């Protein structure tokens, strides 16, 4: 499924439910939109008794995955059946008063993060918001539910991948970019989640958690913005399946879109001399295309051969052959 989802992706996982699951999904959604925080969806019509429980559990998970604005929903749910009526119970993590207070802060935070994007092309809107979120948040796992929903990122400026993802999805949808949550694994963190967004109709992978600035450089890398499935699979895996859009385009990848790819040492020297001058910027993002060469060694060699003076610090993303060069003036 790679077509652009309706409602900016807000009912994406609903589309994979069977009829009974969709009925339960709609029932839960109607209650939550009416600010019913009882944590009980009663009188759910049962069409197929044999799959009633699993369908309702799937519906609840789909609601949570589709709607990061429902940050107050807990993880587990409980289903009971009386005849052809089902009752789904789920935990509400906060009181109604706290929910309303957090909702106000969420609206305020999202407005701040998307400010100034209205007149920009879609991809420039995306880049600006992505960078702001990456700079705003720090990765911290406090062992609390706030790390996994919007509360940690909005109130404390930190969280884990689910928190990062929730804020990114809310902001993307606010600026008109369809997006959905994707689950998978990584080589370093085990289970992980990130975003698939549709840029000009094409689905791409975005992992803002992995683009958090490192403490040394303090600069957003954009390594994981708008990747194809092939590109992100160098260190993300077990994310393929019928529910995950087929992301094949690489033309919106940050480095390609910005014209930051170099194919030889000569090109590398030219780009460094052109962009790392005293009168221009002091940092340079590059994708070094020759896979057989070590980017770190190539940059060091190119700097020595160039007409630049001073010193540089070099940061590499070996998996994607990306280089961040910071010139110390």
Give each language-model segment a name.
Residues 160, 168, 312-316:
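Structured core of small recognition/catalytic domains
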Residues 55-58, 62, 101, 105-108, ...:
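Extracytoplasmic/secreted proteins, especially bacterial periplasmic and envelope-associated proteins
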Residues 96-153:
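Secondary-structure boundary elements
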Residues 28, 155-159, 183-186:
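Alpha-helix capping and helix-loop boundary segments enriched in small/acidic/polar residues
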Residues 150-164:
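A short, highly charged nucleic-acid-interacting micro-segment common to nuclease
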Residues 1-120, 231-329:
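N-terminal accessory/pre-domain segments preceding catalytic cores
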Residues 88-89, 152-156, 202-208:
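Short, well-ordered strand-loop elements centered on a beta-strand within folded domains, enriched
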Residues 163-231:
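Hydrophobic/aromatic-rich core segments of domains that either
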